[in-house]
């Protein structure tokens, strides 16, 4: 054994051992030392036995003791060598660990340097965009101050505001309002389209707890319009779910629904429909064909087909969703009524009015039984049914439904219907009768203004829409005075709480005179179901305004001064060139009129204000 140990030292003097060779030699020497230690231990035990025998016989005891001492010293040296070898091995292991940590830290430093450079570039770009935005904001603030002053003059153009809003509603793509996504509905049904996404529900399939935080984050980004963040976040989460849970897991279907919702908000209906088809196949295979989540996915897919104008393809999907919900929830569940509303709207776009009436009437009966007559869904469904009646020319049935909506809203607000508290439509018809029985020269027939003024309180967008639609129906019947009463009430309710000047001027305008206007609404219709409030009626009418709105001479002087100041301001903001008509910022009607060099002079008596006529013609 000693020869083995000594043999390890017979290396050339000029040769340098590597770390691996040193470690190998150290392990080999350690094994040799352990063997030598075992041999010495055995010899020492033998000598101890010999000493015991010699003590009994009394022979050469000293020599044996000397051998034992030598063996003990050798064993101590061997143990020292073993401990040193163990220290060397532990040190080598520690150095290896430190080296690997050092390599990791170097890689992390390189990555952080790259990220720091990227952040510096992003910061520089953001600072440039911020500088441009601040310049634009400063320019817009100057124009805003001027337009705020112009807005105060437009209190005389309230009729023009009403016409502009209705023309805008008629030109709007109705499909954006026709099909609210089922995932946007909550119990109150009062969220707008941007806010509805933030309250997204999964229609019978609750989002798993581990996905809820991610879902809320994605919806928040989508509501802010930050799709460049929401879409990659959804895709990354979808890839992680597919890798960990498999493509056929229900959570993957939930994530596909969320991504489809984001694409839907971006008007990418094809991509959203593709994702919903994948989610539908997953849910059918994992949850069963009759699960409520399958019904929700079918409904959302039908919604997307409807937005693309594929009503025939959407109808069987919606019909199947209705059958599932009737089977799972029962025929009188509110979700069944929502599905009936969707199916009715699809049939309405295909001209199947008998089916539309049947579905709306059944949905209305469910809402009244399950939620009560005061639930907002009841008023919305009645509004949609009335729109269907109007399309078929059933004006008396539509008028009855509109009056029921307004009467119910009045009862909720005032508690009863009596001589002191009448619904707004009763006031409108009374004013119509008074306008026919009295001539305008005999005096102002609106001394009772305060009575119907109190009935104008409207707290629901559905009621506001009903006011406009019933007013349109009155105009078609030639009841111009009643129509204007309802339209003024609807306009007041839209401005209530947002335009204090308009609130204080309603009574003054009615006291000065009753300016009627010629109105014409486009052929398009817009109805919101399952949480929508808009219902623009497809009605055309024309009326000859006999009232006049006198303008004072001081207002003409103000407009002369305003013309000069506005021209200077526009030249200052945009140079010598005039503002193009296609500007993204909507200008005040009065300013548009003043900047036209060939505009006709102001008339002293007309049904519509000059600024409103110009605004309507330019749009």
From Swiss-Prot:
GO terms for cellular component: cytoplasm; kinesin complex; microtubule. Residues 156-200, 571-619 are annotated as: Disordered. One of its GO terms (biological process) is microtubule-based movement. The modification Phosphothreonine is found at residue 612. It is found in: Cytoplasm, Cytoskeleton. The modification Phosphoserine is found at residues 174, 460, 565-566, 590. Keywords: Acetylation, Coiled coil, Cytoplasm, Cytoskeleton, Microtubule, Motor protein, Phosphoprotein, Repeat, TPR repeat. Residues 609-619 have a biased composition (Low complexity). Residues 592-608 have a biased composition (Polar residues). The keyword Acetylation applies. TPR repeats lie at residues 55-88, 211-244, 253-286, 295-328, 337-370, 379-412, 464-497. SMART domains: TPR. GO terms for molecular function: kinesin binding. Its main location: cytoplasm. Residues 179-188 have a biased composition (Acidic residues). Residues 32-150 form a coiled coil. InterPro entries: Kinesin_light, Kinesin_light_repeat, TPR-like_helical_dom_sf, TPR_rpt. The modification N-acetylserine is found at residue 2. Residues 156-175 have a biased composition (Basic and acidic residues). Kinesin is a microtubule-associated force-producing protein that may play a role in organelle transport. The light chain may function in coupling of cargo to the heavy chain or in the modulation of its ATPase activity. Oligomeric complex composed of two heavy chains and two light chains. Belongs to the kinesin light chain family. This is Kinesin light chain 4. The gene is Klc4.
